[in-house]
Amino acid sequence: MSKPLVSIVMGSDSDLDIMREAAKALEGFGIAYEIDVTSAHRSPDRTADYARKAASRGVRVIIAGAGGAAHLAGVIAAHTTLPVIGVPIPSTSLNGLDSLLATVQMPAGIPVATVAIGKPGATNAGILAAQMLGLSSAPLAKKLEEHKETLANGVEEKSKKLRITLGT
């Protein structure tokens, strides 16, 4: 198995159902990844160590998902120069809005690229990581272009079906 280029990390194993969507997106592009659990609050030393050592494992992008206080992506970004993508996880309160705000509101100098809340966000995090890696990989860039074409073709098909259904 090849070294992981992307690290998917989550604050709790209860986030796995959502973060699997990032893994599926990466698998669709043939990108190797690792997946783990670490907590910004319950295991801060482990989280900092994980972030510091990611590049030495061959990781080039980190995707971090967390709910509630959702400081995981920010703590990781504070301990690495690798790009960090934050996925806000919906929590029992505020439907994930709290997670979104905690993930997106980073101080200047510690960027976290934040995507949408939940499964759509996790999918987009995987695709965004692929786009970052595609900047230095022509074969991956081609796969990304093909992905966009597939999406566009799907819309075209839906448009045709709708026009037929409506008789226009």
Which residues does each predicted region cover?
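Glycine-rich phosphate/diphosphate-binding loop of Rossmann-like nucleotide-binding domains
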Residues: 2-42
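C-terminal binding/interaction regions
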Residues: 4, 10-17, 21, 97-168
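Short glycine-rich or small-residue beta-strand-to-loop segments that form or flank ligand, phosphate
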Residues: 5-10, 34-36, 62-64, 85, ...
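Short glycine/serine/threonine-rich phosphate/pyrophosphate-binding segments
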Residues: 15-19, 43-47, 66-75, 94-97, ...
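Short, solvent-exposed amphipathic alpha-helical segments in soluble enzyme
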Residues: 22-27, 52, 79-81, 130-131
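N-terminal beta-loop-helix "entrance" segment that forms/cooperates
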Residues: 35-56
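Active-site nucleophile and cofactor-binding loops and adjacent substrate-binding regions
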Residues: 39-40, 65-67, 88, 116-118
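Glycine-rich phosphate-binding loop
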Residues: 50-88, 92
